[in-house]
């Protein structure tokens, strides 16, 4: 998609499935100089993590999670573009799939994004901040979220932005 062809890719965290630790290093065969088992660390062979990762992959394949994400991603993008961004021209959107960020860095109040997360919590939505100076409101719902719950969360996010923008005026 971005035209990047890496020599090395490091994957970790949720790749283990069900919250168990697991990390992988993928190396382009053209530069791989290790023999199997030669490149390892002090925490190797966590069989429980391998089993959990396998179960997670099987779940994703059986439940067509990638297809679900492709169906829900436009819902999120369109909602934010049509319902949230028009609230204020200083809001900027970036993201892909079900990982989105609403950049609030153009607001003079450098705590604006933090206020949005607090208001979202009042609307029963837990969201986090990201980006430089925590100026980006991060939306990252579960990949398996149902559409009704997703839309409910998006409406809560919009309400949080509306509340914070009213307080500015």
Question: Residues of each region from the PLM?
Answer:
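Conserved N-terminal phosphate-binding loop of PLP-dependent enzymes in the Aspartate aminotransferase
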Residues: 1-169
């Amino acid at each position: 998609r971005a035209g990047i062809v890496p020599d090395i890719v490091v994957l970790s965290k949720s790749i283990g499935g069900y919250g168990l630790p697991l990390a992988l290093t993928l190396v382009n065969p053209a530069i791989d100089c290790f023999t199997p088992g030669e490149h390892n660390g002090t925490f190797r062979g966590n069989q429980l993590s391998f089993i959990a990762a396998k179960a997670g992959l099987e779940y994703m394949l059986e439940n067509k999670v990638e297809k679900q994400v492709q169906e829900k991603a436009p819902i999120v993008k369109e909602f934010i573009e049509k319902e949230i961004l028009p609230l204020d021209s200083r809001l900027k959107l970036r993201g892909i799939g079900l990982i989105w960020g609403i950049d609030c860095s153009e607001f003079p109040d450098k705590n604006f994004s933090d206020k949005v997360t607090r208001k979202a919590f009042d609307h029963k939505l837990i969201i986090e901040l990201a980006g430089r100076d925590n100026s980006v409101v991060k939306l990252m719902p579960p990949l398996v979220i149902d559409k009704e719950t997703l839309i409910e969360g998006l409406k809560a996010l919009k309400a949080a932005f509306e509340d914070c923008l009213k307080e500015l005026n």
